[in-house]
A protein has these predicted regions:
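Active-site cores that bind ATP or allylic diphosphates and position pyrophosphate for catalysis
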Residues: 4-393
Length: 393
């Protein structure tokens, strides 16, 4: 059983999943799948974002959830950042939206994505959400200049429906997204696992950051780092998941660092700052991570109108630190590393104390140089990554 698997994992030195059991909602038997499909009253085509949520529910990335939240669970999570009943921490509500007026409690809904049957939802609850309240409580603002607020206001439809999920088939993606069970099976016994979250290609400063995190005071010897990029829909100006995947594979092959593990997460960012930091920690705990690297502006967002930050630079870090013990995890502060002419990469404090010459290249300037065919300094980006980007964007 899944409970036995979780206990076995804990016995071999892996952190327990959130709630103590790694959920697996996938139906394996083909006859059972056929019966589940035949029992459905209606079908619903999923958005890219919803498909990510169905996948993470089905494979246990959102453990201990076993489906989309019903109205009571949704309200409780929005207001308290906890799951109703167990009172376990949970950063953001997991909901399914629909415009269908006819869907009713008791319906069996076939969930489809890109022509494929991915799951069945048994509707336990249908309601019109208070979206301004959700925005204010979860994102800290009701301004539609915030991408997450714009998403719930304009992309999500009139109703939310909640209920248990049965997984049929995982969405087909052009890159692999190993399940929590698969990632855990590849982790070392009894060692710390430090998670690094990103949604962009990995450049030199990122690599320095997550490799140095393995030397942090609260990280044990022989620890490994799980580089775990989010691969769902991102912001409009972000590089596509497939192109980023190609850069990660190329870099992993180049560095061949035995302390670095790579896996890909079918999660769509909300840019919800502090509450999303908690969500990321819970997900990474389910994937077997004991530590989480968190830096300035984690899951942060700027106004699309005036460029002002919606969150303070350390809001997410403070929220993560305040709740880490309850999650049974530890945070690792993200070092502010800079490149210097004299000593290569050092922390900004060391550079300042020694009066070293710091070299800088903004992300905007990097993209301009990339598109213009200019040489990219090797201190800023890996040649192999630049080559992949040039070939694909």
């Amino acid at each position: 059983t899944r409970a036995y698997a979780a206990a076995a994992a804990a016995g071999r030195g892996l952190i327990e999943p959130h709630g103590g059991e790694l959920v697996n909602l996938m139906i394996v038997d083909e006859k059972e799948k056929a019966r589940a499909i035949a029992s459905c009253d209606r079908a619903l085509e999923l958005s890219d974002r919803n498909a990510c949520d169905v996948e993470l529910l089905s494979v246990g990335g959102f453990s201990p959830l076993r489906g989309f939240m019903n109205e009571d669970a949704y309200e409780h999570c929005v207001e308290t950042m906890r799951l109703k009943g167990s009172e376990l921490l949970f950063g953001l509500p997991i909901v399914l939206d629909t415009a269908c007026e006819d869907t009713k409690v008791g319906d069996r809904v076939l969930l489809k994505y890109q022509g494929k049957d991915v799951g069945v939802l048994t509707v336990e609850s249908k309601w019109k959400p208070n979206k301004p309240k959700e925005a204010k409580m979860c994102y800290g603002t009701s301004s539609i200049e915030h991408p997450g607020v714009a998403m719930i206001s304009m992309e999500r439809r009139k109703y939310y429906i909640g209920g248990k999920i049965e997984g049929l088939n995982l969405p087909q993606r052009p890159f692999p997204c190993p399940t929590p069970e698969q990632v855990r099976a590849d982790l070392p016994t009894g060692k710390d696992v430090v998670a690094f979250q990103c949604r962009n290609p990995v450049h030199r400063a990122h690599y320095e950051l997550f490799t140095r995190a393995l030397d942090a005071e609260n990280v044990g010897k022989e620890a490994v780092c799980l580089v775990h990029p989010t691969m769902g829909p991102t912001q409009d100006d972000d590089i596509s998941g497939l192109v980023r995947y190609k850069t990660y594979v190329t870099l992993a092959d180049e560095v061949k660092n035995p302390q670095i593990r790579w896996a890909y997460l079918p999660y769509s960012m909300h840019m919800a700052g502090p509450r999303e930091a908690i969500q990321h920690m819970i997900i990474r705990k389910n994937y077997g991570c004991t530590h989480f690297i968190i830096g300035r502006d984690m899951a942060g967002s700027k106004s699309s109108l005036d460029g002002e930050d919606f969150y303070g630079a350390y809001d997410a870090q403070d929220m993560a630190k305040a709740n880490a013990a309850e999650l049974g995890m530890q945070t690792v502060p993200s070092l502010n590393v800079v490149y210097t002419e004299e000593e290569g990469y050092v922390t900004a404090d060391v550079a300042k104390d020694k009066g070293l010459n710091v070299k800088k290249l903004s992300g905007t300037k990097f993209r301009q140089m990339l598109r213009g065919g200019e040489d990219i300094p090797e201190w800023f980006a890996f040649k192999s990554v630049v080559k992949v980007l040039r070939e694909n964007i």
